[in-house]
């Protein structure tokens, strides 16, 4: 019984274990399933995103429109990136990195600008004469469209008499040893020669006109063209030139007109249908110009307003324009013919205008004419004129076949020279030609009809001679008249027969070919010319800088008053007013002698003549002084001579108000003959110090016993009422003058008062160093032996803004009269300390003068105003 119970218990336990294990397995399966679902979702999301990227990448790839698989899309993308990397490397290798090339211009823009400046164009021809590239500038020089020349033989545009010589020149690179000997080879593969080229015309039936041109270039092997660009090259050169082009050599040259032109046409337009508006009066004068006009014609609105529109039109178009304007006045609106407009860059641009007349809203009278000008290309103009002549305009067959065979718009005239020779791909990359030149106002260049050369189309081969040419050249405002010019001598007579079908001549096989560098010889020649031009420009810049420096120096001298205004703002000036002079007499002055001051001799007769005119000539010394700080900031001063002179009038027997800047040197009278006035002005360091002792020695010199001093020039001349003292508060210190002989001529005392205006802001004065106190005490003891002058206290100086120096009496005596004057002219800041040598010298002078002086009475008193 017990066994049965235990067995039942064990079986129940086993059942529970099995159920728990099953439940655990189910839970694990659920977890794994959830993980798989999540993983599948993320994988599907990743695949969808990858497919979207592949589809987007495939849509960006050029070529087939059919659906491509993923591997094809990736392969084409890799090929494109590899080709792009190669092209970038080639572009960087051929980039012009010299200093003479502006950094803001690309190679194409720089090349086009240089060609326009040189009156030339690029031409790439095969050795058999087939033209594979021509730059757009050929239109403005020879009136040919690039499409007229490409895939044509160069011999079709050269006189028959010159075919043999040109063919011989183009074939020189095929010779083994004799190829470097001809005279037209400059260096290695570079050559230069001259010939005539046919000028394009609107009417092919017109007589042929040739221009004398110069070819400068070198040969370039087409083996250097990358393999990835061969397909593009096959689309560029046509039909018969495709086989064995790897073994061919082309001649790349810069073709320049032998005779430069003055004004040339601007014939290419990168952005068609460019337009701008203007308003004209009924007399066809400009009243308004649109903001879109300056980038096109170069003129700003204010440059053309008020001028007649006929001033900018080509003389050959005036007759047709006059008819169009007559039609406008009759019908009120209309469209003009194609005409040429002279831009600010002295180039002709083709325009067509739609215009109408606006009427006043009240009286219905004509008010002005509104014009909308549209820029057109020379190709449109030529096609329109040929249609008027009944000539069917058609592109060359080769060009038409080329566009059909290549299957893309790879116009050779818009492909740069580098692409035509190195990449030859399908994508057109227009060179920056007309727009850059049209928007830049460069100087005059040429007129397309200036120097044509008439050459008769004869089957014979006569020797080349001077070829006369006569054609009228229109210039703006009729400033240039018609000119007749003779072309240059072409050279020796032709020695070989004419080869009219040079394009069909076979090229020998197996001949050696030269491997040339990527740098074109034409660009090297252009570089040399630009370097020479750069040196000339630099010389002009240096000369202009030197002239500018001289002008600035003169302006600094002329505009010295600006510095004076700065000093008057930063430092207070001096105001000398109420110069009181007692009754004087100038009739006793009999003789004037030169005055020697500071080592300078001033003739007093010249000063006398100036005083008779009632003026005192003052020469200005400009002093540049920095603001004095409250701390120990040193003063800096600089004297600059000025070309101006200041006239100050003094009237005798009256009061005069003298306002002088800090740098004035007054001219004051001195009647004594042979007198020499030496006026060193001291700078006291404290306003409470004793006054300066002034002595007059036997040699009639004024000397001061102060230490280190600033010497003030005081040139004297006779004046009727005494002397005028002009001190300089900031720099000059005390200024005293004396007249030993003038006192003998007067019977009553004279009073001399000088007003000094104190600064508006009184800076705290620095104390004198301790080592200078014994010297001051010694000086004070010496001054006590003589009649002293009382000095006002510090409180008096601060309360009264002006101080006076009065001399109450001048005693009569011998010429060595001693005069003690005190001038209380305190400074803002600490002044220069007195030197020991000067103080010792002053003491000796005082001791010497003590034996020679007379008694003095009533020392001068300083009284506040």
Curated annotation (Swiss-Prot):
Its main location: cytoplasm. Residues 514-564 are annotated as: Implicated in the circadian rhythmicity. Component of the circadian clock oscillator which includes the CRY proteins, CLOCK or NPAS2, BMAL1 or BMAL2, CSNK1D and/or CSNK1E, TIMELESS and the PER proteins. Forms a heterodimer with BMAL1. The CLOCK-BMAL1 heterodimer is required for E-box-dependent transactivation, for CLOCK nuclear translocation and degradation, and for phosphorylation of both CLOCK and BMAL1. Interacts with NR3C1 in a ligand-dependent fashion. Interacts with ESR1 and estrogen stimulates this interaction. Interacts with the complex p35/CDK5. Interacts with RELA/p65. Interacts with KAT2B, CREBBP and EP300. Residues 450-570 are annotated as: Interaction with SIRT1. Residues 107-177, 262-332 form the PAS domain. Ubiquitinated, leading to its proteasomal degradation. O-glycosylated; contains O-GlcNAc. O-glycosylation by OGT prevents protein degradation by inhibiting ubiquitination. It also stabilizes the CLOCK-BMAL1 heterodimer thereby increasing CLOCK-BMAL1-mediated transcriptional activation of PER1/2/3 and CRY1/2. The gene is Clock. Residues 336-379 form the PAC domain. Induction: Exhibits no circadian rhythm expression. Residues 371-864 are annotated as: Interaction with NR3C1. Coiled coil: none annotated. The modification Phosphoserine is found at residues 38, 42, 408, 427, 431. One of its GO terms (biological process) is positive regulation of NF-kappaB transcription factor activity. Its EC number is 2.3.1.48. This is Circadian locomoter output cycles protein kaput. Expressed in brain, retina and harderian gland as well as in peripheral tissues, kidney and liver. Localizes in the brain to the suprachiasmatic nucleus (SCN). One of its GO terms (cellular component) is chromatoid body. It comes from the Eukaryota. The record marks 39, 43, 47 as: Interaction with E-box DNA.
């Amino acid at each position: 019984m017990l066994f049965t119970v235990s067995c039942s218990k064990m079986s129940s336990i086993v059942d529970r274990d099995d159920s728990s294990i099953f439940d655990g397995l189910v839970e694990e399966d659920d977890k794994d399933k959830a993980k798989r679902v999540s993983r599948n979702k993320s994988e599907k999301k990743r695949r969808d995103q990858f497919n979207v990227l592949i589809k987007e990448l495939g849509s960006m790839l050029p070529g087939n429109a059919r659906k491509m698989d993923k591997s094809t899309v990736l392969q084409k993308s890799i090929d494109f990136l590899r080709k792009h990397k190669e092209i970038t490397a080639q572009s960087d290798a051929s980039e012009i990195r010299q200093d003479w090339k502006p950094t803001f211009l690309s190679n194409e823009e720089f090349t086009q600008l240089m060609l326009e400046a040189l009156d030339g164009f690029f031409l790439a021809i095969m050795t058999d004469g087939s033209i594979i590239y021509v730059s757009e500038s050929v239109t403005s020089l020879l009136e040919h469209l690039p499409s007229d020349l490409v895939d044509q033989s160069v011999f079709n545009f050269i006189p028959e008499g010159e075919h043999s010589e040109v063919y011989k020149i183009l074939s020189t690179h095929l010779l083994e040893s004799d190829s470097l000997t001809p005279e037209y080879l400059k260096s290695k593969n570079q050559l230069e020669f001259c010939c005539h080229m046919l000028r394009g015309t609107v009417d092919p039936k017109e007589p042929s006109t040739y221009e004398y041109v110069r070819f400068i270039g070198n040969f370039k092997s087409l083996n250097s063209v990358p393999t990835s660009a061969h397909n593009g090259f096959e689309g560029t050169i046509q039909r018969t030139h495709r086989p064995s082009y790897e073994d061919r050599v082309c001649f790349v040259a810069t073709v320049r007109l032998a005779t430069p032109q003055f004004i040339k046409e601007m014939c290419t337009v990168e952005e068609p249908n460019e337009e701008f508006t203007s308003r004209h009066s009924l007399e066809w004068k400009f009243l308004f110009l649109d903001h879109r006009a300056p980038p096109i014609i170069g003129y700003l609105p204010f440059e053309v307003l008020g001028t007649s529109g006929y001033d900018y039109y080509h003389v050959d178009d005036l007759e047709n324009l006059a008819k169009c304007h007559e039609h406008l006045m009759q019908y009120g609106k209309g469209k003009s013919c194609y005409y040429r407009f002279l831009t600010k860059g002295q180039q002709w641009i083709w325009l067509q205008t739609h215009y109408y007349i606006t009427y006043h809203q009240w009286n219905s009278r004509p008010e002005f004419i509104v014009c909308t000008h549209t820029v057109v290309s020379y190709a449109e103009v030529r096609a329109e004129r040929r249609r008027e002549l009944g000539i069917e305009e058609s592109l060359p067959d080769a060009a038409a076949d080329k566009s059909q065979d290549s299957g893309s718009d790879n116009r050779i005239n818009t492909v740069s020279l580098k692409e035509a020779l190195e990449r030859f791909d399908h994508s057109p990359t227009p060179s920056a030609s007309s727009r850059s030149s049209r928007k830049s106002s460069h100087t005059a260049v040429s007129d397309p009809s200036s120097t044509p050369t008439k050459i008769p189309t004869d089957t014979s081969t006569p020797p080349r001679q001077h070829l006369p040419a006569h054609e009228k050249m229109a210039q703006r405002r009729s400033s240039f008249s018609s000119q007749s010019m003779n072309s240059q001598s072409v050279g020796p007579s032709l020695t070989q027969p004419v080869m009219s079908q040079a394009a069909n001549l076979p090229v020998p096989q197996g001949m050696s070919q030269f491997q040339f560098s990527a740098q074109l010889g034409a660009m090297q020649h252009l570089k040399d010319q630009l370097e020479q031009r750069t040196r000339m420009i630099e010389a002009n810049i240096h000369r202009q800088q030197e002239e500018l420096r001289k002008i600035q120096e003169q302006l600094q001298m002329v505009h010295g008053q600006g510095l004076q205004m700065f000093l008057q703002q930063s430092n207070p000036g001096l105001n000398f007013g109420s110069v009181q002079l007692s009754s004087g007499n100038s009739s006793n002055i009999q003789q004037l002698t030169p005055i020697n001051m500071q080592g300078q001799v001033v003739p007093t007769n010249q000063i006398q003549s100036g005083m008779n005119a009632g003026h005192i000539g003052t020469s200005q010394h400009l002093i540049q002084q920095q603001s004095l700080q409250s701390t120990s900031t040193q003063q800096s001063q600089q004297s600059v001579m000025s070309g101006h002179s200041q006239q100050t009038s003094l009237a005798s027997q009256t009061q005069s108000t003298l306002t002088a800047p800090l740098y004035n040197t007054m001219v004051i009278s001195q009647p004594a003959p042979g007198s020499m006035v030496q006026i060193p002005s001291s700078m006291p360091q404290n306003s409470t110090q004793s006054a300066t002792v002034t002595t007059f020695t036997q040699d009639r010199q004024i000397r001061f016993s102060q230490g280190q001093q600033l010497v003030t020039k005081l040139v004297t001349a006779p004046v009727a009422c005494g002397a005028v003292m002009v001190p300089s508060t900031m720099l000059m210190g005390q200024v005293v003058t004396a007249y030993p002989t003038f006192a003998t001529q007067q019977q009553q005392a004279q009073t001399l008062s000088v007003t000094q205006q104190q600064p508006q802001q009184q800076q705290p004065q620095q104390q004198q160093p301790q080592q200078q106190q014994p010297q001051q005490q010694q000086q004070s003891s010496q001054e006590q032996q003589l009649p002293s002058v009382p000095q006002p206290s510090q409180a008096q100086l601060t309360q009264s803004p002006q101080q006076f120096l009065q001399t109450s009496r001048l005693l009569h005596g011998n010429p060595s009269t001693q005069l003690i004057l005190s001038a209380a002219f305190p400074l803002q800041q600490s002044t220069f300390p007195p030197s020991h040598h000067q103080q010792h010298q002053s003491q000796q002078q005082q001791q010497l003068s003590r034996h020679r002086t007379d008694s003095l009475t009533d020392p001068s008193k300083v009284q506040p105003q």
